[in-house]
């Protein structure tokens, strides 16, 4: 089973330090996703400081839209294949900082696919997508751009 969704986008927990640098697209109690200069990173709260998460065996393969692609529909299906050495615990997709309503599944708890589409049509031009996945101890996030 793949757990999809992280909760609300950019949800900040009170009393905790802020992840970064960059734009926080997701912040839970122990895990966060940040984008800075077009590069996404998963972060883990260790003590009272956010640190880059260990990727370990967590892998993400972008299925669509293809990185750098042009002429995509204005409501594109965004999808990623996920895998890890341990059970996947959480995953999510964003476009332009807005979390998608994801669906997904897999044949094992360590491999799966998530996909979703923006709730409203995207404007013509370039957009940034982010995919995120984590296990209990490792996490990874990847960003890519595509054009409508």
Predicted regions and their residues:
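Post-signal peptide N-terminal segment of mature Sec-exported envelope proteins
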Residues: 14-37
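Bacterial signal peptide processing site
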Residues: 7-9
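Short, solvent-exposed loop/turn motifs
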Residues: 30-32, 50, 99-100, 139
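C-terminal motif of bacterial Sec signal peptides marking the signal peptidase cleavage site
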Residues: 3-5
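Glycine-centered loop/turn motifs
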Residues: 22, 55-56, 67-70, 88, ...
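Long, low-complexity serine/threonine/glycine- and acidic-rich segments characteristic of extracellular
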Residues: 79-148
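Short, compositionally biased P/S/T/A/G/V-rich stretches that sit at domain boundaries
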Residues: 35-38, 44-74
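Structural motif
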Residues: 26-27, 35-36, 46, 95, ...
């Amino acid at each position: 089973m793949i757990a999809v969704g992280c909760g609300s986008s950019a949800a900040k927990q009170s009393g905790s330090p802020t992840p970064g640098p960059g734009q926080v697209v997701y912040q839970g109690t122990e895990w966060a996703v940040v984008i800075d200069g077009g590069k996404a990173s998963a972060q883990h709260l260790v003590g009272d400081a956010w640190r880059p998460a260990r990727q370990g065996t967590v892998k993400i393969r972008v299925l669509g839209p293809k990185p750098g692609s042009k002429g995509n529909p204005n409501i594109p299906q965004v999808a990623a294949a996920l895998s890890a050495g341990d059970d996947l615990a959480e995953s999510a997709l964003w476009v332009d900082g807005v979390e998608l309503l994801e669906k997904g599944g897999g044949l094992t708890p360590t491999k799966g696919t998530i996909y979703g589409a923006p709730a409203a049509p995207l404007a013509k031009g370039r957009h940034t997508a982010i995919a995120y996945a984590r296990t209990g101890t490792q996490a990874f996030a990847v960003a890519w751009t595509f054009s409508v």
